[in-house]
Amino acid sequence: PQTVIMFYAVNLVGGIANMVHPLSSEKEIEFYLKESGSICALTLDQFYHKFEAVRQNVESLNNVIIASIKDELSKPIKVGYMLTEGRKIQKIPADAPIIRWKEFMQMGTRYRWKYKVHKEGKDPAVILYSGGTTGITKGILLSNLNFNALGQQIIATNLMFRPGDRMLAVMPMFHGFGLGVSIHSMLSQGGRCVLVPRFTPQSYAKLLLKHRCNFIAGVPTLYEALLRLPTMEGAD
């Protein structure tokens, strides 16, 4: 959820979100940061060392904010996570020049000055990157109008949609499909998103049935995997 929060927060204060694949190599991350002139980076603790390795090469980068999966988990699930996946993550040095996500959120509660910036439809909102199939990957600058038009068009052509409907969002948020269709189209029109942190057909089906999601957006292989699951037989 930190990605969703920061995406809208950056837009609110007049910034541009630069969406990067978290599994990118250090060289690729350095390119993305330099190409965009990013002044702040938000990443998970498990990817901290990639950013630390390139930080000195990116003059514009002033702050690195570190979030953790455990930040948003309930206490019982957090304990289980720390005993399994969490223990595999390399510890960040205590004196590392970073801002922890919880600390960052607390800093916001003490801020008393004006921070909202009025933006026009033509103003840039986000940078997404091409696949690089014909050469080096390219940053694609999209405007507020691009994203809002997408949201309105998707909902306008879907007569079944009602405010409060749920989307099971599994597509990555550094991808236009995931960020534009699964997230912004729903939230901007009064819908809700159920975030899927890590995809497996079994976990996806479980969340779909648990939350009784009204919509899903995915690629053909996702639907093929769901159709092969016994738990989806006759599911409503």
Segment roles from a protein language model:
Residues 148-166, 174-215, 224-225, 229-230:
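Conserved AMP-binding/adenylation subdomain of ANL enzymes
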Residues 1-26, 170:
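Conserved AMP-binding/adenylate-forming
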Residues 90-129, 136, 159-166:
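Conserved pre-ATP/AMP-binding loop-to-beta segment of ANL
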Residues 14, 133, 190:
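Conserved G/P- and acidic residue-centered "switch" motifs that form tight phosphate/ATP-binding loops
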Residues 8-13, 34-35, 175, 187-188:
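Short hydrophobic alpha-helices that are characteristic scaffold elements of the AMP-binding
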Residues 10, 41, 124, 130-133, ...:
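Conserved S/T- and glycine-rich ATP-binding loop of Class I adenylate-forming
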Residues 26, 34, 39, 46, ...:
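Conserved adenylate-forming
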